[in-house]
Every structure is written in structure tokens, then in C-alpha cells.
Amino acid sequence: MDTFRKWLNKPKADDKSLLARFYHADRSLTAVASELDSFDGRAEPDRCTRLVSRLRQNQDKVLAITNLIMEELLGEERDPRAFRAKFPEEVLQENLAGQLWFGAECLAAGSSILNRESESKEMRPLAQAVTKSLSNVRVLLRDQCLRNNVPNSKTLHLDFNDSTTEQLYESLKIFDHLFAEFELSYVSAMVQVKSRHEYEMQQWIGVLFSETLQRALKIGLLDQDMVDAFDPGLMFSIPRLAIVAGLVIYAKGPLNMDMPGDELSEMFRPFRTILIKIRDLLRNLSKQELYQLEKLLCTNEEINTKVPLGYSSIEAPSPEPNSSNNHNNNNSNSSDSGSAKTSTTSPHKAVERLVDHRNNNNSSSCSASAATQAVARSPSMLSLSAGSTPTASPAPSPTPSHSIASTSSAATTSTNPPANWSEDDDDDDEEREDDEEECGMLDSDEQDLNDDSDSDVDEYIEAQLKAIVAAADCASGYLIPNTNLGNLLQPQTAPLTDNFVASEDDEFGAEQEQEQQQRQREEQLQPSSEQQEEPSTSAAMLAARRTLQRLRLPSSSSENEQTTGSNQQSTIKTPNGGGQPMRSGSQRQRHHSHHHHHRHHHHHHHHRQHHHQQQHQPAQAEQHSHHHHHQTHPHRTSRSARKRCSQEHWESTTAEQQQTIDHGHGLASADTSNASSFSDDVSLAMRNTTARLKFKSTENLLHRLFVCIAGVADQLQTNFASDLRQILRSVFLINMSSSQEDIDIPEKTKESELFEFRASENDVIQESAGSNQSIYSAEEVNPELDNVFNMGNGNGGGTNAARHSAGAAMQRNNTIDLSGGGYNNNNNNNNNSGSSSSSNSSTVARSHVARSRSLGDQEAATSGTLQEEQRQQQQQQQAQLQLQMQRQRNNSVGSNSPSSSSSSSSSSEHNSPISTRSGSRRRLHSNSASMPSIGSTATTAAATAAATATTTTSATTTTTTTTMSPPAWIPDGKAPRCMSCQTPFTAFRRRHHCRNCGGVFCGVCSNASAPLPKYGLTKAVRVCRECYVREVRSSRTQAHSQASRPQAASAS
């Protein structure tokens, strides 16, 4: 019985129904599997390889058709496959199902995945269940092919009351569940699949990218047009900006480096070490520097930082006459008394920031003493912080690092350069340097502290000052190039270069200048230096006090302004109490020179800074030269001698500072818990600033930050290309300015709607009313009523023109009544002048139809104009007829003019897009319709001449080939199914656009290719089957007509 059913109901090879396609694919798979089992694969490896390739192709085909059947039968009951979102993009291929089936059979047969033995052992039972379930499904589907197959049916026609159909339904559900489970297990074993947490972290990274893009658009780093145009440069700019924003702007987001490493996204986990160091540097940048860095990351332009690195970021108070000297502004004019205009960085402001809090909380005598000591040191502090310090922030900085740090560094004394220290001293000094110079992390809004809060921590501050000031002698400050942290920005896992920090050549050059300047200062030591140590120590203590208190207690800007105003007078008074506004320039310069006796670890540009000041301060030039140029000793001090001198001087300075602290303030006990937490805050803030102190200038810092950030972001393009593409695609779609207009899928209900109108030579306007290259658009023409589709009518060109005009009027919702006399006249003239006059009069009719439409359907004017111009056209056509008859006679004696004309016409019509569908059959038909009317008055030669005239006219009107714009593509989201076979698209069945109609089709329905010269596409491109049939058929018909026309003309 089964044999009979198989013989009777066997699907034919051309049957396109799902069951028939499955039947033939399954038979092909069975044949290949049988051939594989028939020989030893080890004996014939080449044949075995070919058969295995065919086997996998057939498995793909069988599973693809099975998937379509399950999609139709199960529908929403299919097992969900949301886990595919976690798969890499490279895994989701069309042949994934075949790979899974092949892997399941291998595992079921006892094989194991390479280096995945444990996972293979776990998956083996599941693989056996999958292969067994799939075999059962194949048997049931083959049975359904022989029972319920309907030839060429697009849907399944199963008998749901039959037990075999119910059994097939349940078997498909079981197979679908097992296959989905095996897919997840197998792919997870083969490639790394994200966990739930990692997938959520990737989504947070996408949110960070989107927020970064919106911020960049807001501040003007990027343009909305770049986002709308999907600028490829944004693929590099957005990840770079996201790193900066994630580390600084959104510090608690997915790039929070304080979270454990295993909680960080796997995209940035390999770069955690370098990201922490980048974050520490970014936190010390001002707003202007951060903007310059972000702009550099977007445009790759050169860094242009005109503001010096040590330029103050604190705004000076309102200018007052003779209040300060300007040591930073080169354009200032110095008077004889040394007074100058107040600039952004003034010694008055620097001193005020150091002692205003001290003046608020201590007695009047202590306040005056502190102010005096600070004023005595202010010029040196200013010169270090403003012009020569390579580690402070530029002017707009919200977190200035110049004043406190440079003050405490400038107020310390030392005798030897840091290159002479031992390794242990280097380590200790670096920690002390961190504690001292982290003061620059403080925000300018927190310059003053609350008076009530000061007493709580004052005693502990005094205890901490001793250690900080004692460490200042050996602290290298801003002045040491990077000597120990050679891999400051070098991650352990990211293959970036080592040249991110200062090189040894730069370090050696800095040490040479420091040693030369140190030799000069050592010879300048005077007994008065001991007297200056106490003010130096006091200034350092005050600076450190303000630093520690700012870290502990916040204050408002209003308090800062009040304190500034109340302490301004006490700050600028002299120790004599005489009420002089400030010391003269010579007095200040003496203090400046005394400071240089003790502070040798200053920047190597400091010497040049004094020369620069000398040019603008004539009153101070003599003393400045005296203190710096009277030394003529060229010898070099040995390292051991400098080391001993450094140690001895450090011990003596420590003892003096201890006595000064004990005498001036005294030490008291403080709260241990508060002290420890306070110390942690100080050390943390100071560690953050230490990294910035290693760079010579702002340009150097920004350049190396750019190299590090760009290196990390660009490695994401390589290591996590798939994830980054998905994130960027989502970001672009979210941040587009406006979504595209919805484009509905056109429903092809009528065969005529599949054709586009293309004007023939009869449709060309040849009068002055319009260009001779103009044609009617598709909106103005009804193809069903046009003579392009009217092949069998023999009423002449005038009737076709009338129909076409009427169709155009219907399209435009206008009513155009043309007088019958005009068209009767037209037909009579056609009968008297041949087919050439028929074509031309039809053109005239079209011309006037268009003109009447534009002028408001003026019937009478149209009829009168038609009759007039038809008379003129008749005379011209008669002259042309005589000329063509003469050319025909020349052709009979060997002239090649008509043949060349015919050949040019043929070539031009073949290449012209506007005559693709208006083949020569219609022109010959028009000629044959007009020929009987002139049979009694013309000879056969005249008829041939008329045909040649028509060909010449066609050649004239089609010489200029116009390229049409390609059709708009339907978006992928608007086409869930193939527009031809209605098969739904899946992750394995991808969409393809037809270049001719713009529709969306599957790979089967759009597997043809053909050139489209009408769109300027001379090479073969993808087109759907319908367009291929239509285009190829029309082109072949046209070519055949053009080839037969010269033969007919020569035969006649």
C-alpha cells in the first residue's frame, strides 16, 4: 500500500510546496549519507571530504525547510531562542543549524570537541536525543508528503483530525525544544558566551556610549549631521569619549574602577590597570584641559595650549593701585617703586590664600607674624607657581593645584638634587612628596573653612605638620622628572608602548641644569639663611594646614569672599606695622634670593624666568643679577659629598622645624579615629595628583593621555568588534534626529502596476513649449491607457495619443475635452503624409494636451492651435518625405547614408532608457497601419522612405541618454516576509534588495542578476525574478526587433 501511495503521490521535481521541497531535500541527504557509509573514508580521503561537504549542505537545506514547517505549524508555541542575543555575531550564520546537526551526530557517535572533553561528555546524551528526535521528524514528514501534499501550495494542507498529523505536531515540539537546548550548550562550549551579568554590563556600556554622544553634541564636540549620516569617524570618536566620560563624568557608571575586577565589563577588564592610571590623571585636569583632550580625541588635531602649565586658576580681587607686582604677565608695566597692575596671579592673592584661615582662628599677634612670614616668602612662591612649575593647572581649572602645593614646596630647603638619594630615601621621599603636593586637588570653591570646625582638627593638624615639613627637605616636588614610574601608563595586559612618561634623556637634562643651579646656590649661602628658615617653615605649615583642613571641612564661596576681604589688609602689611601696602621691589627681591639659597629643587626653567622678569622690572635688575651671577665656580660636586650634605642638612632642618613647631604652637592630643580617616583622605588625594607631577607640560600630559585613551579604544575595535558594532548601532539609532518616513510595502495587485512608464519617441515634446528631452512622469500617465501597452490597435497614432492624453487626465483628476475635429484633422493629415506625419502629429497632440492641462483646459484655444500648427507641420513633412526619397535613390546606387542612419538609430535605441519598452514593433505597427492609406499615391520606395524617416526621427529623439534615479529601498524593518514567496525572514534567512524595484526578497527569489543601464548600472546587479524576466524579455525583444528592421528595409 505504501508503495502504491509513493508511486501515485510522489511530488514532482518542479513542485514548490514545502512538503515537496522537503521530500526531495531529504532524499538527496539520504543518498549522500548512504554513499558515505558505502566506503572507507580513510582509504579515499578526497572523496570523503567532498561527500562530507555535500552532506552538510543537504543538512542545512533539510533543517531550513523543517524550520519553515515548524514556523507554520507551531507558530507561537516554538521554543524561545532569546539566548542568541548573547552569541557573537560571527556565530549567527545561515549554516548554523547544519553545523549543530553535524556536531550532534559526531557527539552521539562518541567523538569529543577538541579541548572540551568534559563539556562533550555532558552534551552527549542531549546530542543522542536530538539525533533520534530529528530522525523521527523526518519519517513523519516524508509520510505527510505522500498523504497530504498539495502541488505548488504556499501553505500546508494537513488533516488535523488524522492521528499522524497530531503525532507530527508533538514530534516537532519535542525536536524544537531539544534542538534549542543543544544549540545553547554546543555554542557555549565552542565560543565564549556572555553570562547574564556580562550581558547587562554590555547594555550599561551602551547607555554610557549614548550619554557620551549626547554630551558631545551638547558641548559642540560632534554634530548631529554626523550622527544622521552614520559618519564612520564616530566609530572611533565615541569609544574614546566614552572612556573619558566613564572615568570622570559618570564615575559611578559601568567604568567605575573602584568596583571589583570581575564585576567590570569584559570589554574593559583587560585594561583595568591603565584605566585606573588614566582616571587619576583625568581627575587633575581643568575644564579647559579636559575639553582640549576630548576635542583632540575627536579630531586628532594638534594640541594648542597657550596657557602655561603653572598658570593660576584663581581669579584675583578687584585691582587696587600699588597692591602687588605682576611676576607672571609679560605685558605689565613696572614703575620705579616696583608696583604693577593686578593680574590673575598676584602675590597678594597667593599670600591671602595661605594665611586667611590662620588669621581667622589665632590671636592678633600670631596673625601678624604669620602674615609677615608669608609675605616674606610670597615672591618665590609666586614665581614657582605661576611661571615655572610644570604641574599646576591652567587658568580655568576648577581644581587648582598650584598655590598650596607650590607654596609648601617652595618654602622648604634642601641642598642636593634627588639623583643623589639612596633607594630607600627615594621611596620615603616620594611618599612625602605625595602628601605634600596633593594639595593641588582641592577645589577653588573650598578656599576657606568654617571657624567653628577649625578647632576640632587644629591639634591634629599641628601634629601632622611636623612630619610634612620635615619631609619637605628631601621632597623632589614638581621638579623631578619621572625616575621610578617608568610604566606609569603601561597596562599589564594591553600591548601599549612604554613611551608614555618622561624619558631618561629628559631626566638627565633636567638633572644637569639642577646641579648647575645648585652649585650656584650653595656658594650663596649666608648666615641670614637660618633666620629665613623659620618663616619658610611657618609658610609650609600654614600651607599644609590649609590643605588638610580643606580636605576635611568644606566651605562655601561666600565665606571665601568674606574671609578674603577681611584678611586682605593683614596680609599685605609689613612686620614693622607701619601700614605700608607692600614691600618695595628691592626688598621683595632680597627675600626671593634668600629663598633660592634654600630651595634648589625648582624647575629648570626658573633661571630663565628670572631673566624674563629682569627685562620687565628694571628696578630689580641689579640685585637680581647680583644674587645669580656673582658665582663663578665651575667644578662639580661629587655624588657622595652631595649625599652627605643632603643628609646633614636634612637632620639640622628637621631639628629646627621641630623647635619652631614646639615654640610657636605646641602639640596636643587629637582624636585617633578622626586622625586616621583624615590621613587616609589626604593620602588618597595626594596619590591622585602625584601622577600629574611627572610631566613637563600640559601639552605633554594631554598628548600622552590621548595616546593611552586612543590605544584602549582602538583595541576595542579589534578585540570586541562584534560587541562594539552592536553597541554603536544601537547608539546611532537612538540618537538620530528624526526617524525615516514609514514606507509601506506595495501590494502588487495588478500586473500593470509592475511596469514603469517609459516614454517612446511619440511622447517627446518637440515644440518650444518644453524641452525636447522632456517626458511625462509616471504620475501623469496611466500605463493601461497608453499606447505603449496598446499593441494590437490599428487606428493610428492619433487615436493612441488621444487615449494616452485621456489617461493622463484621469491620473491628474482633470477633465480634458478635445474637439473631435482636431483629431479628425490629425487623422486625415496622417493619411496624406504617411507614418512620419502620424508620429509627429501625435507628438503635437501630446504637446498641446500638456499645455492645455497647465493653462486650465482651454478647449477652444487648443483646437484652434492644433489646426494651425498641423498645416505648418504638413508642409514640413512633405519636404522631409521628398528628402528621404532622394536618400533612398542614393542608397540604391551604393550610398551608405540610410544604413548608417539606421544603425545609429538601432544603437541609440538599445542604449536609451526611455525606449527600452517601446520596441520597434510599435513603430512598425504604426507604419503598417498608415501604409494602406497612401498606397494609391505613393510607390513602394516612398513607403520605404517613410519608414526610414521614422527611424531617423527616433534616432534624433533618443541620442541623449538620461540616467534615472534608482528606486527607494524598502527598509528591512518594514519587510518581515519575502515579497515574492511570503517566507518570513529569520536570523538565517537574510533580506536582499532588488536593485530594479527596491523590494525585499529572500535569497531564492532574488538570485538573478542583470545590468540596469537605465540607472547607470552597466554591470550585473542583484534583481528579483520578476524584474529579471521583465527586463531580459524586453531587452531581447527590442534587440530582435532592431536586428530585423534593417533586413526588412533592404528586402523591400
UniProtKB/Swiss-Prot annotation:
Which SUPFAM superfamilies does this UniProt record tie to the protein? FYVE/PHD zinc finger
Phosphoserine carried by residues: S555, S556, S854
User: What Gene Ontology molecular function terms does this protein carry?
Assistant: zinc ion binding
List the FYVE-type ZnF regions, as residue ranges. Answer: 972-1032
Record has Zinc as a keyword: yes
Compositionally biased tracts (Basic residues): 588-614, 625-644
Q: What keywords does the record list, in alphabetical order?
A: Metal-binding, Phosphoprotein, Zinc, Zinc-finger
Q: Identify the domain of life.
A: Eukaryota
Composition-biased stretches, type Acidic residues, lie in 422-455
What Pfam families does its record include?
FYVE
Q: Does the keyword Ion transport apply?
A: no
Q: What's this protein's family per the entry?
A: Belongs to the lst-2 family.
Q: What does this protein do?
A: Negative regulator of epidermal growth factor receptor (EGFR) signaling.
Tell me the protein's name.
Answer: Lateral signaling target protein 2 homolog
The species is Drosophila virilis
